[in-house]
Structures are given as C-alpha cells and as structure tokens.
C-alpha cells in the first residue's frame, strides 16, 4: 500500500530539513527520506566539524602569539585524538537534536535510498510513498578525478575521519575547502603544500583577496604551486608523490587531500522515470521558484548549480514551503548579493560583485576604494597577517555593489554590511555612518580616496 503525503523531501541535509520543517509547521503531512545521519554534509563532514577545528587552530595560534603580549602560555601542543573525539561528540549531539526535532514535528522519517517510480511516487527499500509535492535536496559529494593513483588521496570526507594528525600534507585544489584545510592544518603545525590548476588562489573571488591570501599563506609557511596540473599520484617508502603533466614531482607526503570540487548526488535517483531534466554534470535545472521541468517536483541546494552554501539551501527550502503552503505565490529566494566567508587564516568574506565582475556586468562606471594594514591584534607581535578591504561602487550615486574583506574578524563583520548592500546602500551612506573605534571594520566606513575611477584601467592581473 502506498502512503500519501502533502510533501516528500528527498535528503535530510540543510535544504531538505528546511522545507520539511516549514511544511510541517503549516500543518502538512511530510515525509523525509535520508539514508545517513540527519544534517547532511554541513553538519557531518563540512561546515560544523570544520568550524570546530578552525576554532581549535586559532587557539593554537593565540598560544603562540601570547608571549608578545606578556602572557606566558604553557603547553600549546595539539592532542588530535582529543580534538576529534570532542568534535564528534558535538556533531552527535546535533544529530540527536535533529532526530528528536523531526519526530516532534510529526515528520515521517524514512531511512533508505529514494528512487522515483513516476513524477509523484517514490520507492524506498521496497516501500512506496506518494506526494503532491516532491523536493529533491540530495546535496553533493567530493570529486575524485579519474587519474592513475587517485585512490592514494582522500577527500574532505576522509579528512574528517583521520584519527591522527598528518605531518606533511598536499592539498590539491585552491577553492573554499582546500584553502580552509590548508590554514587549519598549518596552524596545527603540519607542513602544507597547496597545488592548483588555476593561476591564482580562490580564482572566483576578487583579485585583491586572492593576492592578500597568497601573501598571508606564504607568511604562514604554506607552500603553493599554481598552474599545476596533476597527472598522477604515486607512493613509495618515502610517501606519496604528486606528478604534474609537465613532469614536475612533489614528493614525500603522508597525506594527500583532493579538494577539486563537488558533484551533485543525483545518480541512482531514477529521475528519468519521472521525466526530470538532468544536465550532463548531474545538476537539476530549476526556474527562479525551484521548479523543475516536471510540475510538482522541485530541486534546491547544491544539486541546482547555484551557490553551494548551507544558508542558501535553507533559505530556498523555507521560501518554497511558504509558496506552496502559505499562500505566498510569489515567494522565492533572491540569489543576488549572497554573502559568503572562507574560513582561512585569517578569514575572508565578500558580498556582491568583484571588481572584474562589476566591470563586465555594469561597464566602465566603477569607483573603487581599497585599504590594507596589519591590525592592532598583532601590535605586539613581530609579524601578523595582513588585512585588506575593497569597496566596489557603481554609477554617479556610487551604489555599493561589492564589499570584499580579508583579515581577522572578516567572518563576523560582513553580515551587517551584507544587509546594507542588499538594501542598496551608497558610499555616502557608508560615509555617514559613525565608525566603531578601534577596530578593523571602521575602515569600511572611513575610506576616502578612490584607487580607481570610471575610465581608469583595471590593474594588471585583475581581469
């Protein structure tokens, strides 16, 4: 016998939980299908365990910096197994919360792997479920290239399973995941090498952030190799070797981490049985309202090819439920001006357009402001990472279309500035805001002279 629901969410990660929770709050009958622990990548092998370890790495840095401020810190060595055990207990508590919360909401939890039978019917381990509305929110998985010896490396999932600290690490990829793991491992004392196919780190970010990040990583002791095309991994008694297409060899690593992107978890869902369009890369295209090409079937989160960020999946899921069940027929997520943070050492953040993006989209109408400095946090230390900031402003009114920050506190300070950008704030609005002193964020409201005006060329390497 087939059980019928108002909504079925396939995937118990951020997006699936959000749409299921909201639909249940509207009194709808909801089923949630998941084969693993609730919380998805973010809770189990992503944002949450990463952030716990990021905090630990900053404590290690603080211990090293303490003597410069007259604080005699003792110890400072890392107990990796203890950190991992505490981290995993914390994740387990979050899993338990979600298990109980889903039950309290009256959501039917279905354990197993879902496959479409038709556009409104799902089969899970021999059990059939149907719904008026089905949401696909199955997230993604780390990519491992098909190269000789690729199995000698681990992914970010494997990193969070490590029971001992790796001592000499190669990270392949310089996106969010690669940069974040590089920073925290180096702060723990590991030797770290990052290789990337692109010609700069975090190539999708503003060039100022990429350049400052490279400078800070170099000062931290992280070795980088750009335009390095990995052809194979090899292993001998000395460890694992990275072999580039041009024959360059980097040798002697005890761990190699693949951080070259993520692929959508859409294989084996039987999407073809429902007639759901799937792109060659596995992404499920949707319109602005999360509709797929099949009425009553929706997709959200990483599988749609949009911003692969937890808050984006949550926001899209909640808005979808409001549209379907709360009479808000035009409710949808605005994907413009979504803020994001990379938890590097120090972190970097952005909202809006980079300078090259703004130039391409808006034309030669930009006024750009920049600053860089070493913050007071390192006033009594011999060295400290650089902070850098950029405002990208457009038109004669100088509407702020991009805010870019790297430095201590960048992760927390950007949220408020993101509200301002979303509301259409101008440079004059920033100027008319009284600064908080002393602090790094005040620089964003006290920038005076532009470094570039309309008609000025982009700086070299900023295209």
Curated annotation (Swiss-Prot):
Instruction: Provide the binding site for NAD(+).
Output: 50, 174-180, 197-198, 230, 261, 308, 341
Annotated Pfam families: Pyr_redox_2, Pyr_redox_dim
Cysteine pairs bridged by disulfides in the record: 42-47
Catalytic reaction annotation = 2 glutathione amide + NAD(+) = glutathione amide disulfide + NADH + H(+)
Comment on bound cofactor: Binds 1 FAD per subunit.
EC numbers, comma separated: 1.8.1.16
Cofactor(s) demanded: FAD
Q: What are the record's GO terms for cellular component?
A: cytosol
What residues form the catalytic site here? 437 (proton acceptor)
Leading EC class: oxidoreductase
Q: Which residues form the signal peptide?
A: none
UniProt: Ni(2+) binding residues = 2-4
One of its GO biological process terms is: glutathione metabolic process
Q: Which PROSITE patterns match?
A: PYRIDINE_REDOX_1
- Coiled coil residues, start to end: none
The record's GO molecular-function terms, alphabetically, read: flavin adenine dinucleotide binding; glutathione-disulfide reductase (NADPH) activity; metal ion binding; NADP binding
- Which residues does FAD bind? 14-15, 34, 41, 50, 113-114, 302, 308-310, 437
**Keywords tagged on the record:** Disulfide bond, FAD, Flavoprotein, Metal-binding, NAD, Nickel, Nucleotide-binding, Oxidoreductase, Redox-active center
Q: What does this protein do?
A: Catalyzes the reduction of glutathione amide disulfide (GASSAG) to restore glutathione amide (GASH) in the presence of NADH. May play a role in GASH metabolism under anaerobic conditions as a sulfide carrier necessary for cytoplasmic sulfide oxidation.
Quote the record's miscellaneous comment.
The active site is a redox-active disulfide bond.
| The protein's assembly and partners | Homodimer.
The family this protein is said to belong to:
Belongs to the class-I pyridine nucleotide-disulfide oxidoreductase family.
Q: Which PANTHER family match?
A: GLUTATHIONE REDUCTASE (PTHR42737:SF2)
Q: What is this protein called?
A: Glutathione amide reductase
Q: What is the lineage of its organism?
A: Bacteria, Pseudomonadati, Pseudomonadota, Gammaproteobacteria, Chromatiales
UniProt gene name: garB
């Amino acid at each position: 016998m087939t059980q019928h629901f108002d909504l079925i969410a396939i995937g118990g990660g951020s997006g699936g939980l959000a749409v299921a929770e909201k639909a249940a709050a509207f009194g709808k009958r909801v089923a949630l299908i998941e084969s693993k622990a609730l919380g998805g990548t973010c809770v189990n092998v992503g944002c949450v365990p990463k952030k716990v370890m990021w905090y630990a790495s900053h404590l290690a840095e603080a211990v090293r910096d303490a003597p410069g401020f007259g604080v005699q810190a003792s110890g400072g060595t890392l107990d990796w197994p203890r950190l991992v055990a505490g981290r995993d207990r914390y994740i387990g508590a979050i899993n338990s919360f979600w298990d109980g919360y889903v039950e309290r909401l009256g959501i039917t939890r279905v354990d197993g792997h879902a496959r479409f039978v038709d556009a409104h019917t799902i089969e899970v381990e021999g059990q059939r479920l149907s719904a008026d509305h089905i949401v696909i929110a199955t997230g993604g998985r780390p990519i491992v290239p098909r190269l000789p010896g690729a199995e000698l490396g681990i992914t970010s999932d494997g990193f969070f399973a490590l029971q001992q600290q790796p001592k000499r690490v190669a990270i392949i990829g310089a996106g969010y995941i690669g940069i974040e793991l590089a920073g925290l491992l180096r702060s723990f004392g590991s030797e770290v090498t990052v290789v990337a196919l692109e010609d700069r780190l975090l190539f999708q970010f503003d060039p100022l952030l990429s350049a400052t990040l490279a400078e800070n990583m170099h000062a931290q002791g992280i070795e980088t190799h750009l335009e390095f095309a990995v052809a194979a991994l090899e292993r001998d008694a000395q460890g694992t070797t990275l072999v580039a297409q041009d024959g360059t060899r980097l040798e002697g690593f005890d761990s190699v981490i693949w951080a070259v992107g993520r692929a959508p978890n859409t294989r084996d869902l039987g999407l073809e049985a429902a007639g759901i369009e799937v792109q060659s890369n596995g992404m499920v295209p949707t319109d602005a309202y999360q509709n797929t090409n099949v009425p009553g079937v929706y997709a959200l989160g990483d599988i749609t090819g949009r911003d692969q960020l937890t808050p984006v999946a949550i926001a899209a899921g909640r808005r979808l439920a409001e549209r379907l069940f709360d009479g808000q027929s035009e409710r949808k997520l605005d994907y413009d001006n979504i803020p994001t943070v990379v938890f590097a050492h120090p972190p970097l953040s952005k909202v809006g357009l980079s300078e090259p993006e703004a130039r391409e989209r808006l034309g030669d109408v930009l006024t750009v402001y920049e600053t860089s400095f070493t913050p007071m946090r390192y006033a009594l230390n011999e060295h400290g990472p650089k902070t850098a900031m950029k405002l990208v402003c457009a038109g004669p009114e100088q509407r702020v279309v991009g805010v870019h920050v790297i430095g201590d506190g960048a992760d927390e300070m950007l949220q408020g500035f993101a509200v301002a950008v979303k509301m259409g704030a101008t440079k004059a609005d920033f100027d008319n805001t009284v600064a908080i002193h002393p602090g790094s964020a005040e620089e964003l409201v006290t920038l005076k002279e532009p470094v570039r005006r309309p008609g000025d060329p982009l700086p070299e390497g900023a295209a």
